[in-house]
Amino acid sequence: MAIGNPEVATMGKENTEAESSNGNESQLSSDLTKSLDLAEVKEDEKDNNQEEEDGLKAEASTKKKKKKSKSKKKKSSLQQTDPPSIPVLELFPSGDFPQGEIQQYNDDNLWRTTSEEKREMERLQKPIYNSLRQAAEVHRQVRKYMRSILKPGMLMIDLCETLENTVRKLISENGLQAGIAFPTGCSLNNVAAHWTPNSGDKTVLQYDDVMKLDFGTHIDGHIVDSAFTVAFNPMFDPLLAASRDATYTGIKEAGVDVRLCDVGAAVQEVMESYEVEINGKVYQVKSIRNLNGHSIGRYQIHAEKSVPNVRGGEQTKMEEGELYAIETFGSTGKGYVREDLECSHYMKNYDVGHVPLRLPRAKQLLATINKNFSTLAFCRRYLDRLGETKYLMALKNLCDSGIIEPCPPVCDVKGSYISQFEHTILLRPTCKEIISKGDDY
């Protein structure tokens, strides 16, 4: 049996111990590496999970926002139908209606724009202003629709009934609280105003007609009166431009403390600067001297003051808070109108007191008029619509008694043509507002 060298054995033992220690160290380092790797993997997984959660939350919040924005869009996307059928109140649920065009007073009244007292007065009058603006918004939407459907060949009575029924829908007609302020005027050619077809009328709108479409709306008796002229033949364009320009001149001149005669002088100067050629003959456009603009009262279309369309009128001044219809008429005829044709417009006398009536039928008709129109103008078609029959004798009796005032059509000479434009303006303490102004005129 061989015996080994002790030094060699010692060295081998040392080597074995060194190898084992090295092995342990490498084992520890590999274990540490694995644990670090596992920690990193877990951290990555945690980060990924967090990112996924954040993504899901963001996606959910985006969906909610989209839903909210969609619901908001749905709420605010209510628009007028074609033909118009949605009441204007539903289109403006806040109850605030669009302002008309604002014009500042001339420099001599500039102090009004800085007066706190004047602005406070405006705030107190806001409910009245809002009623006027609501009536004006109905007027704008109705005339926009009517312009889109007007064409030669239409029966005038169909035209009027379409317009009036649209007004009734959009204004949410409610007796004397909201509705039509006066009958639709659709006067043709040499007829300047106050013509609307009676029941059974077969008049047809022609290509060469010049039609004045004049209608009014009201909320609680606060009336908006506005008119424009329609002509399909471009030959009449200068005639329309004359009255349109003259109307805006009158509006520009109007204001607090302005004399009515000064407005008339400015209107005439502009109107009579125009000429129109019709079928080879040139006519100077004349301002009709016996038709005027007018102040407007509550349930009173023609109040106390008249705004002339020619120079030399009244020295009376316009006053703060007043409502005016500035309307001008340009004619190729004599520039003077007379009553003619069958009467269709009627209106209860605003200042009439108690008048004893003998005819029972007249009393009954007056009760109908008081209930449905009060002192607002009406026409025979409106009485027909209410179911009144065989009323002409009773109506004549009311006219003869001075209770009802007939308003027959007014005409220039035959063969002449007349144009008209009209706006309602409000003389506010700080500025004037063209209540009925729209995109069309």
Swiss-Prot record:
Which residues does the record give as substrate binding sites? H194, H302
What catalytic reaction does the record list? Release of N-terminal amino acids, preferentially methionine, from peptides and arylamides
Q: Where is the composition biased (Polar residues)?
A: 18-33
* Keyword Cytoplasm part of the UniProt annotation: yes
User: Where does it localize?
Assistant: Cytoplasm
Chain positions recorded as a divalent metal cation 1 binding sites: D214, D225, E422
User: Where are the residues of the annotated region Disordered?
Assistant: 1-103
Which note does the record give on the cofactor?
Binds 2 divalent metal cations per subunit. Has a high-affinity and a low affinity metal-binding site. The true nature of the physiological cofactor is under debate. The enzyme is active with cobalt, zinc, manganese or divalent iron ions. Most likely, methionine aminopeptidases function as mononuclear Fe(2+)-metalloproteases under physiological conditions, and the catalytically relevant metal-binding site has been assigned to the histidine-containing high-affinity site.
Q: Which InterPro entries match?
A: Creatinase/aminopeptidase-like, Met_Aminopeptidase_Type2, Pept_M24, Pept_M24_MAP, Pept_M24A_MAP2, Pept_M24A_MAP2_BS, WH-like_DNA-bd_sf, WH_DNA-bd_sf
Protein name listed in UniProt: Methionine aminopeptidase 2A
Taxon lineage = Eukaryota, Viridiplantae, Streptophyta, Embryophyta, Tracheophyta
User: Its gene?
Assistant: MAP2A
